Amino acid sequence: MHENLNMRLALGLCALLSAAGCGLKLQLVDHSVKKPSNVAVYFTVETHDNMPVANLTPQDFVIYEDRQPVSALESKQTILQPEVAAIHYTLLLVDMSGSVVDSGDMPKLIQAASSFGDRVGTYQKVAVYSFDGSPHLTQVVGFGGNVRGGIASLATRRPRDPSTNLNGAVIEGLRLLSHEMEHGPVPLRFGTLVVFTDGTDRAHRASADDVSRALDGAGIESYVIGAGQEVDRSQLSRIGRQGTFASQNPADVQKGFDEIAARIEAASRRYYLLSYCSPSRAGEHEVEIEAKGAGSSGRLNYRFNAEGFGPNCDPNTKPSFDVHHPRSMPPPNVADRPAETAAAPSQGHAKPASWTPNR
């Protein structure tokens, strides 16, 4: 009797948790519909507490049209490689101010940044720029270039200005990312900014409010790695909205790069491009996609028109997302912010707020 009671209580608790929204969260990025009957959906899967859900297979998804399940054998549903329709960029900004270059810790920084590039470069196009007290960034290696070789060259570089233009570097980095995304070769484009610093902004070429406005308008994810005696977590967390590693021990630089690389890697793997062949042959239809994983489930839905659909569909066909109106998905904590304090778009790429460095 006690076992039955415990089971009923457990089931009741599970139902309450599900009702409270503790299942998986699926967020639609874009979808494609093309003849003969191809439907493709690009979306993310996360837990209720915003943890990425990776490694789902086609069998972990159930597709419904007009609330009726579509046979997996009939739909031939599959997960396509995201590279056919999407590209992800990561820009790493490395603090090369006097306090970093003269610290004696450059070999550790170079090793940590190189391993970061190796790991993140598996999933994204990575570029590296450096900053010091100067008004503008200095390119170390462009997107998709030899990251390890470029970072190694930092060993022989000296700052043009020993101060730290951290705020200005973030704003200019957002501009660089936005420009790269605007000229991407595929319709779905995403950007991540990662900043390493050993302290705080000293140049005062731009204010913290300038940085906040630029981040609000960028639709770009941002992370910060801070390792040094002058590190202030509260200041850095305003920049690293998706994640901040802060330590006043310079020896923690490897730990910081590893932690942020792991978070970006996991975030990259939360994206899925699910493709299937629709059995519908005419009219408007509602599609629901249910994902099951991490001991829970969740759904997303949208509508499509099947006019002119027919046989001979191959689900491996490249989707036809809108090239002329590319989409990016703002980071959750920007998109969820009240309208009066956020301006992150769900379509296109807004440029960061206008800013001119104080020279």
What would you call each of these model-derived segments?
Residues H2-L11:
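Bacterial N-terminal signal peptides that target proteins for export
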Residues A20-G21:
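C-terminal motif of bacterial Sec signal peptides marking the signal peptidase cleavage site
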Residues L26-L91, M96-D105:
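Acidic, polar low-complexity linker/tail segments
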Residues K35-V39, N249-A343, P357-N358:
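C-terminal "exit" segments of structured domains
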Residues T57, K76-Y89, G98-V126, V141-N146, ...:
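…and closely analogous acidic/polar surface helices at protein-protein or active-site interfaces
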Residues F61, D95-S97, L109, V128-F131, ...:
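DG-centered beta-turn motif at the end of beta-strands
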Residues S114, H136-Q139, G149-G191, R202, ...:
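Von Willebrand factor
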Residues F196-R241, F245-Q248, F257-I260:
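VWA/integrin I-like adhesion module and closely mimicked acidic/polar interface patches used
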